[in-house]
Curated annotation (Swiss-Prot):
Residue stretches spanning the membrane: 193-213
Family the UniProt entry places it in: Belongs to the VTI1 family.
Residue spans, topological domain Extracellular: 214-217
Gene: VTI1A
Sequence ranges on the Cytoplasmic membrane side: 1-192
Native source organism of the sequence: Homo sapiens
Protein name: Vesicle transport through interaction with t-SNAREs homolog 1A
Length: 217
């Protein structure tokens, strides 16, 4: 499990390093190369998102007691991903302004105003994205807590079942002991009755012997 996560981590590190390098190169490229580079970065950003999803799935499969470290790493990677997307958006805005100026011949003031407006919208989107990410993280943590509670309940249920089994075994043993004691008492009573009968027979025999002896004399 952790080996798969670490493999995705390495792929993510290599990919984000490439994306960072390409984003930094975009402003310095000729228009044709910029267009190709922007398309390439978009594709790699999607690949990075897929890697994050795979890593997130791997973290959910890790036992709760070992999950904390991986969850912290995931938060760091998501923040890094958010920064890359922000840098790329700014790079695209600059690229779009440049293309628009070339096609429409807009003056510098209009371009600056539009760029400022786009940057403002971008910042709003980033804030919304951070709120969504925070909500998602809360949902994930809530799910983890729920899973831990379910596991604890499952352990408690197993303990209760084992206790019930022990009680059943104890009841069964008590039942056997009770039957054995009852049998022993019955045999003791029978033996005492036999002794009493034998004693009576002996007394009667002695009395009869004495009676016969007296009559002969």
């Amino acid at each position: 499990m952790s080996s798969d996560f670490e493999g995705y981590e390495q792929d993510f590190a290599v990919l984000t390093a490439e994306i960072t390098s390409k984003i930094a190169r975009v402003p310095r490229l000729p228009p044709d190369e910029k267009k190709q580079m922007v398309a390439n970065v978009e594709k790699q950003l999607e690949e990075a998102k897929e890697l994050l999803e795979q890593m997130d799935l791997e973290v959910r499969e890790i036992p709760p007691q070992s999950r904390g470290m991986y969850s912290n790493r995931m938060r760091s990677y998501k923040q890094e991903m958010g920064k890359l997307e922000t840098d790329f958006k700014r790079s695209r805005i600059a690229y779009s302004d440049e293309v628009r100026n070339e096609l429409l011949g807009d003056d510098g003031n209009s371009s600056e105003n539009q760029r400022a407006h786009l940057l403002d919208n971008t910042e709003r989107l980033e804030r919304s994205s951070r709120r969504l990410e925070a909500g998602y993280q809360i949902a994930v943590e809530t799910e983890q807590i729920g899973q831990e509670m379910l596991e604890n309940l499952s352990h408690d249920r197993e303990k209760i079942q084992r206790a019930r089994e022990r009680l059943r075994e104890t009841d069964a043993n008590l039942g056997k002991s009770s039957r054995i004691l009852t049998g022993m008492l019955r045999r003791i009573i029978q033996n005492r009755i036999l002794l009493v009968i034998l004693g009576i027979i002996v007394v009667i025999t002695i009395l009869m012997a004495i009676t016969f002896s007296v009559r002969r004399h």
